[in-house]
Amino acid sequence: MNSTSLYAAIDLGSNSFHMLVVREAAGSIQTLTRIKRKVRLAAGLNNDNHLSAEAMERGWQCLRLFAERLQDIPQPQIRVVATATLRLAVNAGEFIAKAQTILGCPVQVISGEEEARLIYQGVAHTTGGADQRLVVDIGGASTELVTGTGAQTTSLFSLSMGCVTWLERYFSDRNLAQENFDDAEKVARDVLRPVADELRFHGWKVCVGASGTVQALQEIMMAQGMDERITLAKLQQLKQRAIQCGRLEELEIEGLTLERALVFPSGLAILIAIFTELNIQSMTLAGGALREGLVYGMLHLAVDQDIRSRTLRNIQRRFIVDTDQANRVAKLADNFLKQVENAWHIEPISRELLLSACQLHEIGLSVDFKQAPYHAAYLVRHLDLPGYTPAQKKLLATLLLNQTNPVDLSSLHQQNAVPPRVAEQLCRLLRLAILFAGRRRDDLVPEITLQALNENLTLTLPGDWLAHHPLGKELIDQESQWQSYVHWPLDVR
């Protein structure tokens, strides 16, 4: 592999050290290596902000692992940044000097504002949805809050609170008591209060979280079959569960890994304070953060205004998809959606996911015609899809699995991006659009009227169409039968 196309970003965080190695390919990045080690550097800071020898040794040990991988990458294509703990430590110089010797490249201690800016860039390059956003990143010793529109930040704040420092301060007795949570939340709200007005002034349409705490919440919710949106009610529910467990070493929540458990209660308390103080309705997980911001900064790639469209284009190119046919199916599905939207009340994000499924529905053909829907579902489940959340990927895979043949109703109910009923409705529209665009020519798509009354669909074709299209009639009869097996009434006239 040509080493000039390789880039590395290393983030010396207060809780974990991370390394990301990517390859630039056709204007996008392909992840080759991700290494993360829990170093808990912030736990080695004493009251005088002196970093202990043990904490420094843990850090250097980790960097020796990273150094081996960096040998293959040109130095101008490596960026190493250090954040909150090394901003605070009075003896940071000692740690950094040895770190630079181990890695063989400069280590830059960045300001809180620069960290916030890079986090925002990482989110802007990798996360779909509305472009007016609030980004929250809870680190080990600092929390970054950024508002912005598109690629541009409108306000940036880095606050002195993090999941490691809050663990040492409010849960040092390892006791998960209500009082400990109350104290941790109260002080976190006090820290937030001075910046809350400016954040609210700039406003946001979506809120995304870009930290281990948010990642852990996402894993818990996926494991428990909840939808992926983080809300205050869900956070309070998890707090009560933690309090019931009593002690940190006994903390057991389905979906919470042992590795994340130690700093989970402290991160949870900070997140509850942020939700409460800023009146956040819901939050989803970001696709990337600081390390992605560093990489995209080195590559000088512009932020694509529509990340999901870029992702779909890249995948269509890679799997040699007939884009004319994909657009034909999408146009027809959108037409059907408009005809039933008053009856079915389908939200804009559900529409976007349906159209994404249309764009990808034929990728399975690149493997084999036989079982193409299975291949398509497998590919979507396992491909990196910037702009789509894990739950949205699961929904897309489920729709592609059910694009034709008998319907697997349980799979539509197991995804958690949209309610089961909505998944069923999207599936029905996708199947009909694929069926009626099957001749692969715009002039052969009939004029179709679609009406919905609850779950009953009535499909009206031009008067003599069925008589002149015996194969088409057979396919429609078969589809009608398949839909009836899962109690989806389809009346064709």
Swiss-Prot record:
Its EC number(s): 3.6.1.40
Matches recorded under Gene3D superfamilies: 3.30.420.40, Exopolyphosphatase. Domain 2 (3.30.420.150), Hypothetical protein af1432 (1.10.3210.10)
CDD domains reported for this sequence: ASKHA_NBD_EcGppA-like
Reaction catalysis annotation: guanosine 3'-diphosphate 5'-triphosphate + H2O = guanosine 3',5'-bis(diphosphate) + phosphate + H(+)
InterPro entries linked to this entry: ATPase_NBD, GppA/Ppx_hydrolase, Guo-5TP_3DP_PyrP, Ppx_GppA_C, Ppx_GppA_N, PyroPPase_GppA_Ppx
Keywords for the protein's UniProt record, in alphabetical order: Hydrolase
Pathway(s) annotated for this protein in UniProt: Purine metabolism; ppGpp biosynthesis; ppGpp from GTP: step 2/2
GO BP terms, alphabetized: guanosine pentaphosphate catabolic process; guanosine tetraphosphate biosynthetic process; nucleobase-containing small molecule interconversion
Pfam families: Ppx-GppA, Ppx-GppA_III
Example of a GO MF term: guanosine-5'-triphosphate,3'-diphosphate diphosphatase activity
Entry similarity comment: Belongs to the GppA/Ppx family. GppA subfamily.
Primary role: Catalyzes the conversion of pppGpp to ppGpp. Guanosine pentaphosphate (pppGpp) is a cytoplasmic signaling molecule which together with ppGpp controls the 'stringent response', an adaptive process that allows bacteria to respond to amino acid starvation, resulting in the coordinated regulation of numerous cellular activities.
Protein name: Guanosine-5'-triphosphate,3'-diphosphate pyrophosphatase
